[in-house]
């Protein structure tokens, strides 16, 4: 804890409000709310915490706070601050959490469409449906039963669907409002499970078609009836009152929370939503934050009722969710919340079981790898790869795996400084010497195994640097790719030889992952350097364009092509004088002409 934090902790009020933790860059990494700011914020810097909270606290170098009039106001503010700043340690709802709805548009000639977004007063919405496939299947069925307009043809034309009896052309379909009201009512009844009348009507048409010997038409009606029956069986009835409601349950264990939401429409369970995340405050408070984000996202339909667990404050939920909030006390409704809670517990336990299996697999892979190579268990592995195009902008990268998992805070990038032209061996020699001379000089943690991306030549260079130049005793292995650029052979030993490695073994998958990761990291860094070098060389020697303005252009436009496409006004908006903008545009034009000249 630094002096700034110590001083600020003394000034905290005993009031409700929100606090914002910041890292060394000034970035907001966590937003929380508290009934008592002094007690809550001080708790982060006193006593012991679990591992994930320790990690959060280790990054805090400053904090701010905002005092509110009430706990409810603090909750609303917290939700807004999280959505605005997207702190990395706060609950994040998945990006793909929107569900499809069926919508009847409020156009003069209504259409039936699928959408994932709800707009107020923009039509009638039905759903949500669990996925696009289900929504499309229901829509196909409705299209065959109800002749909504399906095209955007001009008023004097009909479309293909009109000839199938599935589209109502502008000039032919009924234009009176009563017709459309009846059609929309029929769809509403159908989607709300009141489809007996529609089935009876279809059955009458099927029998009539059979009597007229129109067997193909009769078969179509039969298929429609079958489709309705299938849709009925896919929905589980959870409640007899046919009400639309969302049912929430949650469970916490080992610093993690799982929230389950059952979407019930017309008494039928149509989908559930599962979200697991670490929590840092009281479970009830983090659950409230989750609910606030869940419904503030416009992709979620707000039902007539929301059921919540016993421990949650109804008034606080009512402040953030504009619908009827119910905390069931007994009977079927309480059992529904209990069912959601039970499912949350099962999902969370499943996560822990999978994590435990993954840990056992990874640990086994490291043990087996050490046994195969005849070395101590390689808990820490450092892997290297070069990247360049015909020797231009040569770079290298190092990735670190600890206990079989990437330790990204230990990753390193290297710009090759002493090598001219495409010489991978010399580049590897320089980078390894720089890395491990520093490890030796500064007493940094050394790896249990070094892996280089390459064959015999690369491994021999690495061993020469490590053993002969630096006098270190760190095992060195090589990962060699085949002609399809896939991990193929593990090279190790003295003399070097291929280590037999079963392709389906956990240790092979671990090495494959390490090689892919170091290659990705090196190539990504090389692209960044190449782009920056290209950017800088084009803008060199322009009067009035110094390093800061170049950096500003690079951050905003990313590429020279983007600058070339920008207007003078767009570039000047960055605070660059008009005369300099004109010089930039002239330089880009001259370079383009030079490249196109024979």
Curated annotation (Swiss-Prot):
Keyword Membrane belongs to the record: no
Report domain UVR positions.
196-231
The source's domain of life comes to Bacteria
Q: Does the keyword DNA damage apply?
A: yes
> Its GO biological process terms?
nucleotide-excision repair; SOS response
Q: Matching SMART domains, A to Z?
A: GIYc
Q: Which residue range or ranges hold the GIY-YIG domain?
A: 14-91
Q: Name one GO molecular function term.
A: excinuclease ABC activity
Species of origin: Streptococcus pyogenes serotype M18 (strain MGAS8232)
Quaternary structure annotation from Swiss-Prot or TrEMBL: Interacts with UvrB in an incision complex.
Q: What is its main location?
A: cytoplasm
Query: In which family does this protein belong, per the annotation?
Result: Belongs to the UvrC family.
Tell me where in or outside the cell this protein is found. Answer: Cytoplasm
- Describe the function of this protein: The UvrABC repair system catalyzes the recognition and processing of DNA lesions. UvrC both incises the 5' and 3' sides of the lesion. The N-terminal half is responsible for the 3' incision and the C-terminal half is responsible for the 5' incision.
User: Which GO terms of the cellular component aspect does the record hold?
Assistant: cytoplasm; excinuclease repair complex
The record's InterPro entries line, in alphabetical order, gives:
GIY-YIG_endonuc, GIY-YIG_endonuc_sf, GIY-YIG_UvrC_Cho, RuvA_2-like, UVR_dom, UVR_dom_sf, UvrABC_protein_C, UvrC
Per UniProt, which keywords does this protein have? Cytoplasm, DNA damage, DNA excision, DNA repair, Excision nuclease, SOS response
What PANTHER family is this protein classified in?
UVRABC SYSTEM PROTEIN C (PTHR30562:SF1), UVRC/OXIDOREDUCTASE (PTHR30562)
Question: Under which name does UniProt file this protein?
Answer: UvrABC system protein C
């Amino acid at each position: 804890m630094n002096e700034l934090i110590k001083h600020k902790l003394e000034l905290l009020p005993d009031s409700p409000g929100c606090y914002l933790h910041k890292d060394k860059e000034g970035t907001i990494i966590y937003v929380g709310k508290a009934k008592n700011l002094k007690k809550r914020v001080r708790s982060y810097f006193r006593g012991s915490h679990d591992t994930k909270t320790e990690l959060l606290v280790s990054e805090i170098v400053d904090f701010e706070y905002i005092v509110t009039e009430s706990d409810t106001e603090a909750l609303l503010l917290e939700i807004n601050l999280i959505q605005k700043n997207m702190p990395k340690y706060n609950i994040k709802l998945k990006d793909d959490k929107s569900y499809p709805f069926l919508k009847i548009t409020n156009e003069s000639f209504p259409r039936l469409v699928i959408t994932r977004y709800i707009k107020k007063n923009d039509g009638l919405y039905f759903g949500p449906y669990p996925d696009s496939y289900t929504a499309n299947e229901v829509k196909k069925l409705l299209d065959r039963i109800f002749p909504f307009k399906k095209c955007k043809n001009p008023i004097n034309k009909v479309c293909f669907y009109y000839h199938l009896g599935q589209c109502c052309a502008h000039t032919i379909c009924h234009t009176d409002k009563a017709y459309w009201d009846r059609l929309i009512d029929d769809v509403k009844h159908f989607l709300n499970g009141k489809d007996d009348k529609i089935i009876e009507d279809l059955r009458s048409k099927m029998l009539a078609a059979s009597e007229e010997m129109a067997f193909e038409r009769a078969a179509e009606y039969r298929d429609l009836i079958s489709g309705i029956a299938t849709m009925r069986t896919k929905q589980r009835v959870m409640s007899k009152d046919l009400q639309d409601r969302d049912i929430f349950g949650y469970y916490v264990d080992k610093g993690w929370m799982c929230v389950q939401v059952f979407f019930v429409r017309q008494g039928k369970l149509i989908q559930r939503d599962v979200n697991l995340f670490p929590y840092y405050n009281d479970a009830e408070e983090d659950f409230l934050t989750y609910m606030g984000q869940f419904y503030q996202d416009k992709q979620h339909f707000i039902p007539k009722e929301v059921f919540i667990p016993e421990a949650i404050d109804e008034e606080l939920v009512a402040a953030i969710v504009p619908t009827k909030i119910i905390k069931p006390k007994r009977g079927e409704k309480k059992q529904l919340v209990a069912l959601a809670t039970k499912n949350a517990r099962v999902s969370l336990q499943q996560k822990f079981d999978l994590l435990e299996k993954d840990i056992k697999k990874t640990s086994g892979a490291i043990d087996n790898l050490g046994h195969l190579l005849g070395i101590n268990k390689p808990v820490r592995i450092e892997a290297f790869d070069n990247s360049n195009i015909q020797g231009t902008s040569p770079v290298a990268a190092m990735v670190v795996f600890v206990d079989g998992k990437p330790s990204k805070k230990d990753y390193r990038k290297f710009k090759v400084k002493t090598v001219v032209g495409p010489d991978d061996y010399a580049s590897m020699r320089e980078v390894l010497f720089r890395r491990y001379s520093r490890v030796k000089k500064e007493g940094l943690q050394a790896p249990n195994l070094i892996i280089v991306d390459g064959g015999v030549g690369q491994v021999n260079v690495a061993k020469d640097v490590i053993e002969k130049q630096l006098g270190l005793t760190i095992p060195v292995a090589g990962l060699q790719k085949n002609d399809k650029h896939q991990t193929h052979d593990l090279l190790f030993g003295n003399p070097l030889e291929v280590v037999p490695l079963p392709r389906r073994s956990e240790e092979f998958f671990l090495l494959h992952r390490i090689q892919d990761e170091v290659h990705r990291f090196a190539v990504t860094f090389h692209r960044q350097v190449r782009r920056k070098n290209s950017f800088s060389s084009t803008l060199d020697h322009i009067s009035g364009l110094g390093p800061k303005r170049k950096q500003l252009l690079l951050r905003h436009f990313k590429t020279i092509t983007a600058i070339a496409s920008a207007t003078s006004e767009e570039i000047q908006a960055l605070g660059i004088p008009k005369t300099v903008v004109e010089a930039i545009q002239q330089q880009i034009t001259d370079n383009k002409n030079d490249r196109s000249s024979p």
